[in-house]
């Protein structure tokens, strides 16, 4: 794209990569038109990462986020609480990662684990030690209720998710679900204006030391 001088902007879903550590790689990504990245972190706890069958390296994730910030690429990090057998302490690892790296993370999306129909976990219930509640009357259901043998219950994860937005979410500029809209905005105005707009539209943010500098 750079060689052909296409002059286009792009965004993508991505996972944190140990192969994306060199500054030159990030310089080239921005030069090619990358303006935002949507990371599926899911969890920052090593045991849960392995259960998810991901190879996320947390230290590499920090470098990815720092390099993206340096070149002007917006990073949106997606996580959830309540993967089967996850304990309160393991969930806290994810919360701690987000809070400690808030200066590198422009926006965050937190949720709780949902057992979707046809998801790999659905077919490995014994391995993940969950009891899936399949109601024959709900044949069009897209997800199922389940109970784990250990760890947080679904209700525990939902409560923790709600507390995150009530108690921890303040330092972030926006809760972004309309990613295409944000992408279009960033391509025109850059990454720094969104936090400023948040403070402008939410004057009470200053009461919590939520300056634009703290949120980007």
Identify the meaning behind each predicted range:
Residues 47, 51-52, 81-89, 101, ...:
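Flexible glycine/acidic-rich beta-alpha junction loops that bind and position SAM and/or redox cofactors
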């Amino acid at each position: 794209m750079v060689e052909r001088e296409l002059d286009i902007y792009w965004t993508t879903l991505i996972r944190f990569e140990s192969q994306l550590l060199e500054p030159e790689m990030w310089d080239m990504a921005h030069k090619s038109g990358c303006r935002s990245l949507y990371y599926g972190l899911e969890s920052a706890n090593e045991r849960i990462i392995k259960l998810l069958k991901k190879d996320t390296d947390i230290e590499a994730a920090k470098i990815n986020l720092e390099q993206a910030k340096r070149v002007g690429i917006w990073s949106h990090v997606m996580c959830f609480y309540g993967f089967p057998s996850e304990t309160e302490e393991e969930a806290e690892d994810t919360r701690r990662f987000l809070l400690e790296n808030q200066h590198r993370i422009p926006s965050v999306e937190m949720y709780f684990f949902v057992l979707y129909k046809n998801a790999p976990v659905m077919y490995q219930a014994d391995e993940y030690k969950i009891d899936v509640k399949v109601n024959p009357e709900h044949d069009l259901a897209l997800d199922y209720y389940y109970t784990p043998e250990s760890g947080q219950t679904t209700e525990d994860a939902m409560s923790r998710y709600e507390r995150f937005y009530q108690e921890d979410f303040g330092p972030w500029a926006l809760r972004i679900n309309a990613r295409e809209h944000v992408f279009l905005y960033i391509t025109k105005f850059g990454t720094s204006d969104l936090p400023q707009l948040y403070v402008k539209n939410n004057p009470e943010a200053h009461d919590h030391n939520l300056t634009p500098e703290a949120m980007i």
